[in-house]
UniProtKB/Swiss-Prot annotation:
Domain tr-type G: 10-214
Gene that this polypeptide is encoded by: tuf
Organism field: Synechococcus sp. (strain JA-2-3B'a(2-13))
NCBIfam families associated with the record: EF-Tu, PRK00049.1, PRK12735.1, PRK12736.1, small_GTP
Keyword Nucleus on entry: no
Subcellular location: Cytoplasm
Name under which the protein is recorded: Elongation factor Tu
């Protein structure tokens, strides 16, 4: 059967549900799809279809994630929901599903719980730009003052982690009530049921409050060098996949990382053995560089628009350490551990100088399965920026995955 063509008529946004276990993330995901299905803008998904998420591998780590898609009048959404808490942590750190925004689900009956806090913190550290809150199970709370209190508590928590707590839209509703109504009458439209209306209200907030992300092609040019070869009489060619932005023949680029940064001019572009006028994000290209010798470029450097990325050696990061069952280490490691950090296309040795747990304490050691903040010093400078993902490897196997939360030097 021929594949249906993906029609790009509306802007595309990636969202996800986050929040404490059993506060209703998966029920809400089901409620959104069934509600929008009445308009023909989604395929209704049952709770158990979302909950039985298939396993996926991202950077060697197994994650259970369910992906659903739906549309509103304004946008096309890809929505990710993870069944287990550990899956969220891994998903957010490895960037298996990059979220442009998230729906934080908080049970009105319980208020914010430890994982609510942890997911907000993670969202902040891995760079989820904006959150919308769904105060779920509002049907179980009779006292309006109690709802006010929970809402206030959520706003304070958001502010604590540098989200604009006063401005974040908070919608009160009941995913289960909406889902029950839609299941009883799948044609229910807006205005016909107060609980279903809350789902529409939530989607209005997601539509208007979560900004449309800048597309990769509109960002400044960056390509990690994968391979280098020389063409007699023409010069040196660096090949790789363009991570973001666009590049034309005649433009100036910088070679960043491993050595002194230097600039050069692009004198030719090729893709699939054909010449190219312009390369854009996602293309695998060969870039011919003026005045650069083959021994001056190596895998692990990046080609970038001048002054958009700089080389660094010291950074703070959020890291998930793989369990033994995931192919990780069998034993803990201590400060001073020197693994390889796999960034974009290359391994660089680095020393882990210190660890910090969520509560601010500095543990002696890190166990497989832990999530921890670590400070790293690389032996060579490479192009690093906040929000960048990396893997930690030892003897060719992945032992951890991380994201840069702060550049130190």
């Amino acid at each position: 059967m021929a594949r249906a063509k993906f029609e790009r008529t509306k802007p595309h946004v990636n969202v996800g549900t986050i929040g404490h276990v059993d506060h209703g993330k998966t029920t809400l995901t089901a409620a959104i799809t069934t509600t929008l299905a009445a308009l023909g803008q989604a395929t209704a998904k049952r709770y158990d279809e979302i909950d039985a998420a298939p396993e996926e591998k991202a950077r060697g780590i197994t994650i259970n994630t369910a992906h659903v898609e739906y549309q509103t009048a304004n946008r096309h959404y890809a929505h990710v929901d993870c069944p287990g808490h550990a899956d969220y942590v891994k998903n957010m750190i490895t960037g298996a599903a990059q979220m442009d925004g998230a729906i934080l689900v908080v049970s009105a009956a319980d208020g914010p719980m430890p994982q609510t806090r942890e997911h907000i913190l993670l969202a902040r550290q891995v760079g989820v730009p904006s959150l919308v809150v769904f105060l779920n199970k509002a049907d179980m709370v009779d006292d309006p003052e109690l709802l006010e209190l929970v809402e206030l508590e959520v706003r304070e928590l958001l502010s604590k982690y540098d989200f604009p707590g006063d401005d974040v839209p908070i919608i009160r509703g009941s995913a289960l009530k909406a889902l029950e109504r839609m299941t009883a009458n799948p044609k229910t439209q807006r205005g016909e049921d107060p609980w279903v209306d809350k789902i529409y209200e939530l989607m209005d907030a997601v539509d208007s409050y979560i900004p449309t992300p800048e597309r990769d092609v509109d960002k400044p040019f960056l390509m990690a060098v994968e391979d280098v070869f020389s063409i007699t009489g023409r010069g040196t060619v660096a090949t790789g996949r363009i991570e973001r932005g666009r590049i034309k023949v005649g433009e100036t680029v910088e070679l960043v990382g491993l050595r002194e940064t230097r600039s050069t001019t692009v004198t030719g572009l090729e893709m699939f053995q054909k010449t190219l006028d312009e390369g854009i994000a996602g293309d695998n290209v060969g870039v011919l560089l003026r005045g650069i010798q083959k021994n001056e470029v190596e895998r692990g450097m990046v080609l970038a628009k001048p002054k958009t990325i700089t080389p660094h050696t010291n950074f703070e990061s959020e890291v998930y350490v793989l369990k033994k069952e995931e192919g990780g280490r069998h034993t803990p490691f201590f400060a001073g551990y020197r693994p390889q950090f796999y960034v974009r296309t290359t391994d660089v040795t680095g020393t882990i100088s210190s660890f910090t747990a969520d509560d601010g304490s500095q543990p002696e050691m890190v166990m497989p399965g832990d999530r921890v903040k670590m400070t790293v010093e690389l032996i060579q400078p490479i192009a690093i920026e906040q929000g960048m993902r990396f893997a930690i490897r030892e003897g060719g196997r992945t032992v951890g995955a991380g994201v840069v939360s702060k550049i130190l030097k």
